[in-house]
Amino acid sequence: MHASRTCGTRTPPASEGLSRRRAGRPFAAILDKTRITSAALEIIGRKGYDGLTMAGLAKQLEVAPSALYNHVTAKRDVLQLAEDHLISMVDVSLFGRAPWEEAARIWAWSYRDVFAQHTSLIPVIAVLPVTNAPQTLEMYETVTRAFAAAGFPQNLIVSSIVAFESFIFGSAYDVTAPDDIFEAGSTVDSTPHFRAALKAGRVNERPADTAFELGLEALIAALARSLC
Amino acid sequence: MHASRTCGTRTPPASEGLSRRRAGRPFAAILDKTRITSAALEIIGRKGYDGLTMAGLAKQLEVAPSALYNHVTAKRDVLQLAEDHLISMVDVSLFGRAPWEEAARIWAWSYRDVFAQHTSLIPVIAVLPVTNAPQTLEMYETVTRAFAAAGFPQNLIVSSIVAFESFIFGSAYDVTAPDDIFEAGSTVDSTPHFRAALKAGRVNERPADTAFELGLEALIAALARSLC
C-alpha cells in the first residue's frame, strides 16, 4: 500500500542541498514534496501558519516561486503536505494486531504528542479537507477497519473518530499551557473551592497527562460499552 | 458576587459613541473595558487574533493609543478581556440546581457553541492564564463547587474540567469544518472501509453535533462511574 506514495514520508531529510552549495557552481537540490514539506514545517514552527507564504517558502528553499508552483499550486496545498506529514508520524501500528482499546490508546497518545509540537497547525488540520492527503486517508482507513472489526455501529464510526480527534486537538494545546495558567491573581478570595481543588491537584506531576488520560479512558470505556 | 465586577459583563453594548458624533463638537464616548472588549472581538472576528494590534484597536475605538493604555497595558490584557467576555456567555446556570450531569451537559454545549463562533480565540484561551479574568474564575469556581458536591475526588476535579475543555475546544473547530472535509479525492480506491463508514454516517444530519454528543456523553458517563 505504501509503495506508490511519493510524499509525506515518515522522516523527511533536512534540506541538504542548502549546505552543500559549492563555490562557483551552484548546487540545485532537487525540489520535491519532501523538501517543500520540511521547509514549510520549519517556517510554520517559527512564524505560525499565518506566517507561511508562497514567496517566503520559495525564499527558504532558495528557488524561484515559479519552481515552487510546479509542485504546489497554493498555500493550501503546502498546508496539506505539512498536515499529511505530521499524520504520518502518528502511531497506528497496533490497529488490527491488538485489542482496539489498546490500539486506540497508543494512537491517541502519539497523535496528541505530534500535534503538541505543532499546535499552530491545529486550526488548519481541524478544518482542512483530506483530499489528496494519502497518509491521513490511510490513517482513517486503518482506524475505521479496526473499529468496524470491533463491532462499532457503522454509522457512528466516523463520529467516534472525530470525537477522539477533537479531544486530541484540544489536549495538544493543553500540553503547551504555562504552569501558572490557573493562578487567580488579585481575585483569589472569591474562588475558595477552585483554589482547594487546584491545591489538591498538585499531586499530579504532569497535569496535562492526567487530564488527557482521564478523558481518553472515558472515551474508550464509553465506546467499549456501546459495543455490548 | 457580581456587584464588584467592572468588566466582562454579559452583553456589552455596541459602541454607541461612534455613531452619535455631533458636527463641530466631537462626542467622546467614555472609554471603558466594555467598549475595548467589543472592539477587540470585532477585530479578532475579522482578522484573527494575530490581526489584533494595540494601534489598530485604538484606531477602531477612535482614541489615541495613550488613552487605550490607561486601561490595558498590552495586547495580552485585551485578549484576556475578550476571553473573559466569551466565558461570561457560557451557561453555568444549572450547577448547584440540577444533577451535575445535567448541568455539565448544558455547560459543555453552550461552551462549545460560544467558541465555535470565535475559533480564532481558541489558541489564546487554551494557554492564557486566568489571572484577573473574573468571569473565567467564577466559572471555574461554580463548576468546581458542583463537582466537589457530587463527590468527585478532590485531586481530579481540575483535571476533569480540563478534559471537558480540551474536548470542547477541539469540538468547536469541528463545528466550522467544511462538509467535504472527508472527501477522499483521487486516492478514493484505497480506503474502502472509511468510505463505507462515511456513507453510513450520512444518516447523521449534523455530524459535528453527533460527534460532540458521543464524546460528551462518554466523558459524563465515565466521570459519573468514578463517583460510585
Predicted segments with their positions:
Chain A
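N-terminal intrinsically disordered/low-complexity leader segments
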Residues: 1-31, 192-205
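Hydrophobic alpha-helical connector segments
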Residues: 92-138, 164
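Short, basic, alpha-helical segments at the C-terminal edge of helix-turn-helix-like DNA-binding modules
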Residues: 83-89
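Amphipathic alpha-helical interaction segments
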Residues: 35, 77, 106, 138, ...
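Hydrophobic alpha-helical bundle segments that form small-molecule/ligand-binding pockets
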Residues: 137-188, 201, 223-227
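C-terminal all-alpha effector/ligand-binding and dimerization domain
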Residues: 209-228
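Helix-turn-helix
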Residues: 35, 39-77, 81
